[in-house]
């Protein structure tokens, strides 16, 4: 490809609204352009990378035995009503009506559509197992699109769906897709980890996320220091403390704390250790209990894990905090003064709080706290659960080592759905005994467009992108110095371009009438792995200059050897 015939569209300056490195570089390298909030046009350079990710994913998913299909982006709303997800998805599900006032949605995922298809097309166990996938545009009406294509409203995704006669078959299909993901991300040259995850709105019995490790990642991942255990912080279990609760050494006393509205203020003003304080959070209760509010009690230095809270039968989904008005109506006090002593509402205590003694908490009276609280003596302990986020140094749930935390970008997710959707939509087949059996489903997603951004977050420097070879928009750049003033430089560049192109190598030939500095900057910004510089001075010495984008090393290569040298670099 000649730059004179190509839409290069590089930018010198970083746009002000680009927060993360990948967004900045994708705009500057001419990969994408913003059309509206969360909506992007993919320019030729970006599309070349996107297609490479697609092709690697397609090859590995094909190798795992899945079959490609293509489903509509527009889906009938009634399908979503069949599974009950029409409400669970919330406002992210974009709904609209056609001219006949029939309700539809823009597809964020396709469990309902594929289940309806299999329900109609597969009738016998002899047709199983089957795994169908597509690579297609999806739409989620994100409330706050940000970070470019990392969290866009419209995005490209590979979504696959397996159907098996039993759980053993599902586990086999799930493992095959797990292995296919690993092979795909290995080929892309990414540093990634599969981690245990919550199933969220998709549902099902078990799931894993695939995270590209990057400091800009939105997710925190917990890793064991001595095993291969890894989990999203939403899923990582906070192991119950191994110590027994100490015996009381203090009497419970009521203390005036008019200026202590937060744990930090309480600690600073009254000299109590933060590990000896608790936070009492009021959340909306589910229909499983009669009370409108349930209290969740965690240690003062810990954070509530909202996913763990939502998974409690007593807590409404999605998690919703009680308002100040609701707190005052129920107990007569507001946030900052709440606690378990004398509380007339159901409460659930975190494991770490259950072993505390002589601790401080709000007295359910504005501006007052109790110090020296002890379970059993001053208040009954009641229900205990894992409510908090893990922190570095916590024991690993696997029993080996402690936990360390790193940030990651989720690029893939696999689920063992079981019969959540197939049962709701009556998707079954006749087994070998002629009995109708509801199918076991798995679903699998890779954010193809997000992989592009994640790869940049992991591979960049101050000059621009450093693509892994498998993802680069072009494999080789040819930069002829002052080509339009030197006939022999032009002839050498044209000859080399023709030779490399004939070999099937993807080459970007910079034939613009530009200063060499501009040409070098653009090639580094775009991130082409291998650059050949052709100039009069080097030709006088009988060589071209080869530059490796990742290492930055420059190597003189004899003109007669350059083709074989490049072939060796690409192997």
UniProtKB/Swiss-Prot annotation:
InterPro entries: aa-tRNA-synt_IIb, aa-tRNA-synth_II, aa-tRNA-synth_II/BPL/LPL, Anticodon-bd, Anticodon-bd_dom_sf, Pro-tRNA-ligase_IIa, Pro-tRNA-synth_IIa_bac-type, Pro-tRNA-Synthase_IIa_type1. Its EC number is 6.1.1.15. It comes from the Bacteria. GO terms for biological process: prolyl-tRNA aminoacylation. It holds the Pfam family tRNA-synt_2b. It is found in: Cytoplasm. Gene3D superfamilies: Anticodon-binding domain, Bira Bifunctional Protein, Domain 2, YbaK/aminoacyl-tRNA synthetase-associated domain. GO terms for cellular component: cytosol. It is an enzyme of class 6 (ligase). Homodimer. Consists of three domains: the N-terminal catalytic domain, the editing domain and the C-terminal anticodon-binding domain. Belongs to the class-II aminoacyl-tRNA synthetase family. ProS type 1 subfamily. Catalyzes the attachment of proline to tRNA(Pro) in a two-step reaction: proline is first activated by ATP to form Pro-AMP and then transferred to the acceptor end of tRNA(Pro). As ProRS can inadvertently accommodate and process non-cognate amino acids such as alanine and cysteine, to avoid such errors it has two additional distinct editing activities against alanine. One activity is designated as 'pretransfer' editing and involves the tRNA(Pro)-independent hydrolysis of activated Ala-AMP. This is Proline--tRNA ligase. It comes from Vibrio vulnificus (strain YJ016). The gene is proS.
